[in-house]
């Protein structure tokens, strides 16, 4: 039997099912050394001063790493845990353990790619080959009907071509057994305090008590698909904001790779065979394709995803108004739908997709505040932060994305009436408005003094007055947007045809 040892570097792929770097090493009859490295750069500060990894996501990560270690131990191996820069930690392990090759799942955005390049450079003098695999999307790049650099800019075009001609491979099975680790200290999983973070307080109002790890992710899928059979109504319920069952909530486990998109797809196919095939089963795959799209767009455009001008290259004079940003961040804008969602995020690390669209629109289209401030706050606080999806969606909502539709303004009042008609969600997170009737709960600023007394809420005391006029602020920011758009087109018209 070969004594070759392969190091499998775990990143955002914290699972044993559908894991090609692991499976490939086993196919070579190699001894496997699995590693997770806590990179201190991921626990530093973002440009606007927020924690890059906040306490909710950090706790979910620690739980996921601990679950992976338990899984590997059950298979006869273990997980090495180290703290430091991977491009320094891995070469040291290569020398210590006589590693013959390094396997990992590749990423697509700049911070992660820099680490990959630095690792390859550090391993080159050691003559240790590095093999990168793709395992984060539903569709493998090799099965796309176009090259990465030719990815359609519009999601609809991407989706139609993928649905028509791209194959989706089945997930790889989890190994039944792993060879034991060589003699090496496995290392301790750090505590939140070791990462400079305080333990978040669990809020009983949370829609779901997220627990990190492949085991919990598989259990959530089992519950949502098979125990409660909720998949059959996914399309009709996915925009709800209150309760554990209104959407799959797989996103946190997908973001850290505790669940594989291909495994979810396989389970959907099984559900369609055993239960029902309808527009809801299709729609879950549709949403996974959105996730694929953002990741492939990030791979195509690189750092442009993070430019202030966005993928569209639109130079808008954004404000850095910290006073108003704090009102938005803490849920004190005077618009109940916005405030309820922002307080939910602060208290739990989660917010519905519908909520994210509304609060992002309000920050950029009503307050005119720099979209990077919102994107970085989401990065810090969201349990399910995914770099490509987060920054891609903020590009879109700010109107600077490749698939943006100009100045798309979310009418917060209409959204509230459509998705929270009786005010149950708002009252859940804004107890000061609990006494208001449905006709008033989304527009408390209209309360007469006698109504404020009757319903037990004092505007400007118990709940703030609106920070802006909803429609006047949107009109003012639309004028700024349109001026930037016209300037952008004048510049493009003045450029030679060969330039883009």
From Swiss-Prot:
Domain Photolyase/cryptochrome alpha/beta: 4-138
Cofactor note: Binds 1 FAD per subunit. Binds 1 5,10-methenyltetrahydrofolate (MTHF) per subunit.
Keyword Flavoprotein on entry: yes
One term of GO molecular function: DNA photolyase activity
Membership in a protein family: Belongs to the DNA photolyase class-1 family.
Classification via NCBIfam families: crypto_DASH
Summary of the function given for this chain in its UniProt record: May have a photoreceptor function. Binds DNA; probably functions as a transcriptional repressor.
The protein's name: Cryptochrome DASH
Native species: Gloeobacter violaceus (strain ATCC 29082 / PCC 7421)
């Amino acid at each position: 039997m070969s004594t070759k040892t392969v190091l499998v570097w775990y990143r955002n792929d914290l699972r044993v099912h559908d894991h090609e770097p692991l499976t490939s090493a086993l196919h070579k009859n190699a001894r496997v050394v699995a590693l997770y490295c806590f990179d201190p750069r991921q626990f530093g500060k973002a440009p606007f001063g927020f924690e890059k990894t906040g306490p909710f996501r950090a706790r979910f990560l620690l739980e996921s790493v601990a679950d992976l270690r338990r899984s590997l131990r059950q298979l006869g191996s273990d997980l090495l845990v180290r703290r430091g820069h991977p491009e320094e930690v891995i070469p040291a392990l290569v020398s210590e353990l006589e590693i013959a090759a390094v396997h990992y799942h590749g990423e697509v955005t700049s911070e992660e790619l820099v680490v990959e390049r630095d690792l390859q450079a550090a391993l080159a003098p050691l003559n240790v080959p590095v093999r990168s695999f793709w395992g984060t999307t539903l569709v493998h790049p090799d099965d796309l009907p176009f090259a990465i650099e030719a990815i359609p800019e519009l999601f609809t075009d991407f989706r139609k071509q993928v649905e028509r001609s791209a194959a989706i491979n089945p997930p790889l099975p989890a190994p039944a057994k792993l060879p034991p680790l060589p003699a090496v200290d496995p290392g301790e999983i750090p505590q939140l305090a070791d990462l400079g973070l305080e333990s978040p307080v669990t809020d009983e109002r949370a829609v779901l008590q997220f627990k990190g790890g492949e085991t919990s992710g598989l259990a959530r899928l089992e519950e949502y698909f098979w125990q409660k059979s909720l998949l059959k109504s996914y399309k009709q319920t996915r925009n709800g904001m209150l309760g554990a069952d209104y959407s799959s909530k797989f996103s946190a486990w997908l973001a850290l790779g505790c669940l594989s998109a291909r495994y979810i797809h396989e389970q959907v196919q099984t559900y369609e065979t055993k239960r029902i095939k309808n527009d809801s089963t299709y729609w879950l795959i549709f949403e996974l394709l959105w996730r694929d799209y953002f990741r492939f767009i990030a791979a195509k455009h690189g750092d442009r995803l993070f430019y202030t001008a966005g993928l569209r290259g639109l130079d808008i004079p954004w404000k850095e108004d910290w006073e108003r940003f704090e009102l938005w961040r803490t849920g004190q804008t005077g618009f109940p739908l916005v405030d309820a969602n922002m307080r939910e995020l602060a208290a739990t690390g989660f917010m519905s997709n519908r909520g994210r669209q509304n609060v992002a629109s309000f920050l950029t289209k009503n307050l005119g505040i720099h979209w990077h401030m919102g994107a970085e706050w989401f990065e810090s606080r969201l349990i399910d932060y995914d770099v490509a999806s987060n920054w891609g969606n903020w590009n879109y909502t700010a109107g600077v994305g490749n698939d943006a539709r100009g100045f798309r303004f979310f009418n917060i009042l209409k959204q509230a009436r459509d998705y929270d008609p009786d005010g149950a969600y708002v009252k859940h997170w804004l107890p000061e408005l609990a006494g208001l009737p449905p006709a008033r709960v989304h527009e408390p600023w209209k309360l007469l003094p006698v109504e404020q007394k009757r319903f037990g809420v004092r505007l400007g005391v118990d709940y703030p007055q609106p920070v802006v006029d909803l429609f006047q602020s949107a009109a003012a920011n639309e004028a700024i947007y349109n001026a930037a758009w016209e300037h952008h087109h004048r510049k493009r018209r003045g450029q030679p045809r060969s330039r883009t």
